[in-house]
Amino acid sequence: MRDVIGAPAGWIARAIRTKKISSLEVVRAHLEHIHTVNPRLNAVVFATAESAIKEARAADRHNTRKGALGPLHGVPFTVKDIFNTAGLPTTAGVRIMRSRIPDHDATVVARMRRAGAILIGKTNCPPVHGENSWSPVHGGTRNPYDINRSPGNSSSGEAAIIAAGGSPLGLGSDSGGSIRLPAHYCGVVALKPTAGLIPVTGGYGLTGGMTDPRSQVGPMARYASDLAIALRVLAGPDGIDSGVVPVPLPKRVPKLAGLRVAWYADDGMAKPTPAITATVKAAAKALGSAGCVVTEERPPWLGEAYQLTMGFWGRKHMSRDRMDQRWDAFRSSVLKFMSRFDLVLSPVAPDVAPLFKTKFVSDHQFSYTMPYSLSGNPCVVVRAGTSPENLPIGVQIVAAGWHDDVAIRAAHAIERKLGGWRPASVVR
């Protein structure tokens, strides 16, 4: 069963559906792997071994008698501990919520279950989308590539356990980089979807609706192809989150050949390391070899995005009316830029994973991710390189709104050309 550890979720689903392996075997293998690696990582804070084994047996019986329930039938998954899970604690890393047990699932958890997936654990996160991987409830999570480093914030445990092979697929949340930074630091793939594509209902601290387009829920995995599967499971209105728009996903993804790509390695605020710069250039070259028309061009509105971010976070005084005016103008500028390009390629952060419990020395740590939280554009992070310290380096691929699938397709091309996810040192 070691073969399934590190395998794509799509491959696992096909193997279960065709009865080459059983869901019980797969779930047991991942639970055993979590038992092996989690003491060093502290990524999974609630394991659901008993219920997961029971559900896996039921999944195998159903597969034998009636076939698969959905595209993820029998596949294990994990979720960040901000999502409601019926009968299981949901603490969000907040002390006063240590004994909180919801009686219903978050929309995205329910949709994963309906697709046949089996929950095997909930993962650590800092409170209120905090700035490092430390939780006052569960302690800190370590990076599987170097346990002296952080996996990032705030989908910390999710990125760490996926990178370490303990889960093939998971759910995180992102308000300014909380999916994308951990994906970069841990060398996995992740999607921050178009604002309004996936409901945030049942996610602690995610208000949803048009008043909070920055906060999104998205899938995390090791392979870009698994993001595509999860996107189709998760997208669409739930009748509760008023910000979700009933826009159908396209049936076909356009080919990369001929797509226009703008790339930049330096946003002018947070200077990247040479390794980050080299990785972005390599990713741009990979897209060029896939037939994209690649141009080095930095968007002119990155500085304005930083100022707006400071207003949102209270670092800079700005009235609500003035904020709304500048935000509208900013989004118009992004739309104008994206009318010239199909994709934008950039760093995720200026450096690799910071040391454990290190506080970010500057808000510029988010300067590469926050612009696209404010604009609502979909972003995919994929590993495209390795630092001199042997740490993962990801790149950020931004697409036009509602074209999440195009960003995923580009990530797949980079993954194939540059290697993508690699086994973490903690499990070698």
Where are these regions (language model features)?
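Short glycine/serine-rich loop segments
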Residues: 104-234, 373, 378-394
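A short helix-breaking turn/cap at a secondary-structure junction
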Residues: 192-278, 418-428
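Acyltransferase
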Residues: 23-28, 57-60, 274-298, 320-341, ...
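Residue-level signal for inorganic ion chemistry
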Residues: 30, 52, 227, 261, ...
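Conserved small-residue hinge/capping positions at short loops/turns
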Residues: 62, 68-91, 118-121, 287
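An N-terminal boundary/leader segment
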Residues: 1-54, 289-291, 423-428
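DPxDG-like acidic metal-binding loop motif
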Residues: 86-99, 164
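Glycine-rich, small-residue loops and helix-cap segments
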Residues: 19, 30, 74, 114, ...
